[in-house]
Structure formats: structure tokens, C-alpha cells
């Protein structure tokens, strides 16, 4: 299945049903009076964040989303039926922008979170509602109003506890496969991973969602390699798990290159808590591994964990789970986006 993380769509709420002009017609009742009912409201287009979908692939083949129109009113005071809402599931982490992609409309980053993208029109009023002491037989009514209609740009930023980052071929996909049941493609050449992968790891009662982010190379923040397309997915990770290939001749440069690309993409990324792992240590002797570990710790001023292919991973998962909980508690709340200040288009 293709990983689609952007889509431009057209949404339209249902038109309200028209009001009705009708008069009561029964035997022996000469002046029955008006009995035209109101029209039903049009349905709305509603997006719901769901864990059942992972990409925006649905919108590649369904670029026009519209809700049902309301039904017209009828005689005998019958109101028209309301149009059914069009409820569409989107992945958790979906952001809605205006057509130009400049204004954020909604950010659906919690399961079950809803947003009405295009409200339905109001139903028209039947002539029965216009009856008064001075007008016993009104013959006028109102038409139902049109539903809202917009072009919307959808962008997906996957949500995970841990984002696994590093240079191409650093062993990110292998680690994800070992920690979880994710069947990611693994091979000994760069850019094996062409799209983000999610997996859930369990150990000693701890549950952890990990994301394998495609490898970053120099100038990734400017679009080189696969960086420009996938750097944005790191923004939603609580902490970063930075893998460095132990077999590289210059591990410090490899580490700093990835950190630099994160900084160029967004200054906030460099502020995220980071766990550094020296991977593929089984390819070197213990002495060489110890030497490179000290070198990387001296450069990063962080504790560096060593990892080999045959190592047991439960303790690592428990450790990462504790770091995630700590980061969630200490992380300042994001005040840059207020859900009560969502842009809500006016009806046309």
C-alpha cells in the first residue's frame, strides 16, 4: 500500500431542503389553512481521527467529498428529512489547511477527535410557519440554503512515542522489526526504507509506539534524498532514538550530520529528548566498540548505549518507555495552536 501523506480535496455540505407551500384540503373543511412543512437540514462533512487508517490514500481516489441534501417539506405539516452526515475517517495526526496550505484549520491528533469540515445548509421554512392573525393564508416560503463548500489541503504527521532516526543503513528497520511485529523491508543498502513505518513494542507491561523514519543524508532539510518528505513526521515523536552505525569510519560526523539536518528543518526538533545508540557493535571487537562509545559520548555529552544483533531488547523498551513518560511530563504545552481558534469558513 502506498504511503500518502498529502492530499488536496473538495468538500461540500448538503443543501437544505426547501420549505413547502400547501393548504389543508379535507371534506367539509372550507378554510383548512396552511400546512406546508419545513425542509430538512443538509448533512455535514465530518472528519474523525481513527487508528483504523494509516495514510491519506483514500483521498487519492476520492477527491470530492459531499454530504447528502436535506429533503423538501410537504403538506400536512410534514418536515423534510435531514440529509445524512458524511463521516470520513482520517489517520491520527492529520492536519487540515486552507487551499493554499498557509492557514491551519484543524489538527486531529487524538483518536476520536472530530471536526466539521463543511457544515450542511439550513432547511427552508414552509408556509405554515408564516400564518398569523393578519395573514391567515400565507403563500410564501423559503428555499433551503446551500451547504459550505471548500477546497482543503490535508497533511499527515504520524504520531509515535519514539522516532527512530539516523543515516541510511544504520539499522533502523532491523531494530523496529526486532522490537515489534512490524514487517519492514530490511536489506544491506541505503534507502531500503522509502516510507515511515509504525510498530508497537511490548515488554514487562510497557507499551511503546515506534516510528522508523527513512534515513537522512546531507541537505535532507533542503529536499535531498528522502529527507524533505519525511522530516515532518519526526515533529510528532515524543523522543528521538538516534542510531549510529558503529562500523562507519567517522561516527561523530555521521551523528552531527543528522543533528544538523534536524536543526535546519526545525529548531524545535533539536530540543527533543534524544537517546543515542551505537548500533551493529557485533561487527567490531569489544575494544573497538568501547573506544568508539567513549568518542561519541565525549562529542555528544550524552550517555551512549551499545547494541548488537543478538542483544535482548526488553530492557531497552522499558528504558525508552520511562524516557517517554518523563518527556511527556516535562514537555511544555504547545500554545502555538488553539483548538478554539480554528478557522471556520462562513457560508456563501
Swiss-Prot record:
Stretches of the chain forming a coiled coil according to its record: none
Domain OBG-type G: 160-329
Location in or out of the cell: Cytoplasm
PROSITE patterns with a match to the protein in the record: G_OBG, GTP1_OBG, OBG
Cofactor(s) recorded in Swiss-Prot or TrEMBL: Mg(2+)
Enzyme Commission number(s) of this protein: 3.6.5.-
GO BP annotations listed: ribosome biogenesis
Pfam families: GTP1_OBG, MMR_HSR1
One cellular-component annotation, GO: cytoplasm
Amino-acid positions noted as binding GTP in the UniProt annotation, renumbered to this chain: 166-173, 191-195, 212-215, 279-282, 310-312
Molecular-function GO terms, alphabetical: GTP binding; GTPase activity; magnesium ion binding
UniProt keyword list: Cytoplasm, GTP-binding, Hydrolase, Magnesium, Metal-binding, Nucleotide-binding
Chain positions recorded as Mg(2+) binding sites: 173, 193
Record domain Obg: where: 1-159
HAMAP family on file: GTPase_Obg (MF_01454)
Subunit organization: Monomer.
Function: An essential GTPase which binds GTP, GDP and possibly (p)ppGpp with moderate affinity, with high nucleotide exchange rates and a fairly low GTP hydrolysis rate. Plays a role in control of the cell cycle, stress response, ribosome biogenesis and in those bacteria that undergo differentiation, in morphogenesis control.
The family this protein is said to belong to: Belongs to the TRAFAC class OBG-HflX-like GTPase superfamily. OBG GTPase family.
Name by which UniProt lists this protein: GTPase Obg 1
Organism: Anaplasma marginale (strain Florida)
Amino acid at each position: 500500500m502506498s504511503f500518502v501523506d498529502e492530499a488536496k480535496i473538495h468538500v461540500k455540505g448538503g443543501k437544505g431542503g426547501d420549505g413547502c407551500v400547501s393548504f389543508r384540503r379535507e371534506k367539509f373543511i372550507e378554510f383548512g389553512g396552511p400546512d406546508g412543512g419545513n425542509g430538512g437540514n443538509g448533512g455535514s462533512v465530518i472528519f474523525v481521527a481513527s487508528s483504523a487508517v494509516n495514510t491519506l490514500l483514500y483521498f487519492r481516489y476520492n477527491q470530492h467529498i459531499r454530504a447528502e441534501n436535506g429533503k423538501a417539506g410537504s403538506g400536512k405539516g410534514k418536515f423534510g428529512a435531514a440529509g445524512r452526515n458524511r463521516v470520513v475517517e482520517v489517520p491520527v495526526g492529520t492536519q487540515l489547511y486552507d487551499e493554499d496550505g498557509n492557514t491551519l484549520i484543524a489538527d486531529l491528533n487524538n483518536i476520536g477527535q472530530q471536526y466539521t469540515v463543511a457544515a450542511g445548509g439550513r432547511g427552508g421554512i414552509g408556509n405554515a410557519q408564516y400564518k398569523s392573525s393578519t395573514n391567515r393564508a400565507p403563500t410564501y416560503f423559503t428555499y433551503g440554503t446551500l451547504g459550505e463548500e471548500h477546497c482543503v489541503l490535508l497533511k499527515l504527521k504520524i504520531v509515535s512515542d519514539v522516532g527512530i532516526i539516523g543515516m541510511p543503513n544504520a539499522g533502523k528497520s532491523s531494530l523496529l522489526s526486532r522490537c515489534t511485529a512490524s514487517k519492514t523491508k530490511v536489506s544491506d543498502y541505503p534507502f531500503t526504507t522509502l516510507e515511515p513505518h509504525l510498530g508497537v513494542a511490548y515488554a514487562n507491561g510497557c507499551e511503546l509506539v515506534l516510528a522508523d523514519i527513512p534515513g537522512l543524508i546531507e541537505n535532507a532539510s533542503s529536499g535531498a534524498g528522502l529527507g524533505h518528505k519525511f522530516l515532518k513526521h519526526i515533529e510528532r515523536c515524543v523522543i528521538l532514538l538516534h542510531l549510529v552505525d558503529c562500523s562507519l569510519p567517522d561516527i561523530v560526523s555521521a551523528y552531527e550530520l543528522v543533528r544538523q539536518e534536524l536543526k535546519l528543518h526545525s529548531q524545535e526538533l533539536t530540543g527533543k529528548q534524544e537517546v543515542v545508540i551505537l548500533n551493529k557493535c557485533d561487527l567490531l571487537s569489544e575494544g573497538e566498540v568501547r573506544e568508539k562509545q567513549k568518542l561519541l559520548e565525549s562529542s555528544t555529552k550524552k550517555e551512549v548505549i551499545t547494541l548488537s544483533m543478538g542483544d535482548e531488547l526488553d530492557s531497552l523498551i522499558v528504558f525508552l518507555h520511562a524516557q517517554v513518560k518523563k518527556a511527556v511530563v516535562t514537555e511544555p504545552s504547545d500554545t502555538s495552536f488553539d483548538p478554539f481558534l480554528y478557522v471556520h469558513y462562513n457560508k456563501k
